[in-house]
Amino acid sequence: MAAGKNFLKNKAEASEKKRDRVRYILYVCIALLLLAAVGLILYAARLLPGGTDAVPAATPSPTAGRNQALATPEDWLPQNLAIAKFPPEAVLTDERENRISLRDWIAQEESGVWVVFWASWCPDCNRQFEVIREMEALAETYGARLLLVDRLNREKESVEAARKKIAEYGVTAPVLYDPDEVVYSAWGMREIPSSVVLDKDGVVRAYANGTLTAGQCEGLLDRAFRGRDSAGLAFILGSLSNGRGGVCSSTAAEGDPPTGTDVLSESQGLMLWYALIREDQALFDQTLAFTRTDMLKNGLIAWYVGEQKAGAVNASLDDLRIIQALRGAAEKWGEAPYASLAAEMEKALLARCVNTQGGLVDWAELDGEGQAHTISLCYLDLVCLRALAQEDAALAPVLENAEQVLQGGRIADAFPLYYAGYDYETAAYSQTDLNTAEALYTLWNLSRADALPEDAWLWLRERIEAGTISARYHVDGTAVKGFEYHSTAVWGLAALIAREMGDEAAFEKALRRMDRMYVLDAQDVRFGAYAQKGAAAHAFDQLIPLLANALASGGNEFRGM
């Protein structure tokens, strides 16, 4: 009996020990799961604004009152502001609760104003105040006034608390208050600190979210008062130029030709267009000099040239772009050499880049008789072809052929983009995946010619609104796996198309998406570039945004001719 009891007792104890071991294992598993969850949260935080150096960055802080439903860096920017537009009316108060119109305040100051929204309880705002001396000095350098606007949420903030914080940091800049966050809400602010720069007329010129370094503060003011394209042009001329008017293809010098130090005809044409938008004849002439001296052969432009090797063919799209630039320069500055070179190139293009069917082809040999039997649809620039056909009847069949190829090149109602290319020999359109930059270039050409179908524009506008455009698509409209990444050039082209379509809201949103990889820090050697940290900067990713930014900053419209 005693032995039976001992057996049962030992069995019970063993069972209890087993349960203890199970409980221990469960506790360890739960702890590991919690650690993994924390790790994922911290990793996700790096993807929020502040996790990259290419956009104005703030360390994510729950005290900043962010809406966690927002998903992309652009969603933290002011939602109701637009570059080159007036902000919603803003009435603030001083310490004595006297109402002050911001527009009247700016008029009285007779200068631009750098508005920084903040609050005394915000840790990120405290970090911003650590560079307050630099901020005040930069504002003076750019001829602006720094204005601190306290986010006066009655539940969390008070005038007294704000005054103490200002005294603590020895701030000398003026401070106004936003009772009940009326202006904060009207402007669509998403977090503090956030900066908005207005010119002396009260027009929005730049904005940024989060805690900015001194270098980013300088970059913000540079954008506001020197133009959105100023730093980008400086980066191109300083880091991508060969010193003789050629724009190198990349900051990476290695690889098969064309390498980073080689110059593409694509880049030269885009730089000529930019010079026309900015009415900069000196830049135009410098760019043209290299193009003419080093790239022109038998009336056509080599698609690339380098120190060791040059392309043996042209790229018809680039020749058309350069012809348009030359015609635009002749009209703007009235100098005969521009028109003379344009005529020479037009003659060569007609003689060597048009097939027996009257169709424009992708390329022709510079020294031989060979030519392509295909045409990329993004090469069919109707604006240029129409202008040339009006002056030379021999080009009328080329225009008609281009219109027919484009008309037949639409993929489907459900996916209203255009096939990548057309083969004249097989009379068939390419079924290869679409490079989205090329696909949008086709849409840009059509929009400039007032020929973009409404459903194609709606397709693009929906994606601008959603903030997602893949870098490559199958012809069935699905995104190619592995190409769902952010492309600066794609967003720049989306902005240019929105501009042509007269959709200011879509233009602003596309600019914001485009700016995701913009290097704002004026103390960074890549300042003004669109590039990820540690990655090369490519010319196309700089030049397309350069055009969009120039237009956003008031540049002269140039649609080609």
What do these predicted ranges mean?
Residues 102-126:
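Short active-site neighborhood of thiol/selenol oxidoreductases, capturing the structured segment around
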Residues 26-27, 60-104:
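N-terminal "domain-start" segment that seeds a small globular fold
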Residues 126-168, 179-185:
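Structural microenvironment flanking redox-active thiols in thiol-disulfide oxidoreductases
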Residues 439, 445-452, 500, 513, ...:
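Terminal, non-catalytic domain-edge segments
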Residues 229-238, 258-266, 312-317, 335-491, ...:
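Extended ligand-binding clefts on enzyme/binding-domain cores
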Residues 232-319, 460, 490, 497-500, ...:
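N-terminal carbohydrate-binding/catalytic regions of secreted carbohydrate-active enzymes
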Residues 168-171, 179-221:
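Thiol/disulfide oxidoreductase modules built on the thioredoxin-like
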Residues 1-24:
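N-terminal Lys/Arg-rich, disordered targeting/topogenic segments
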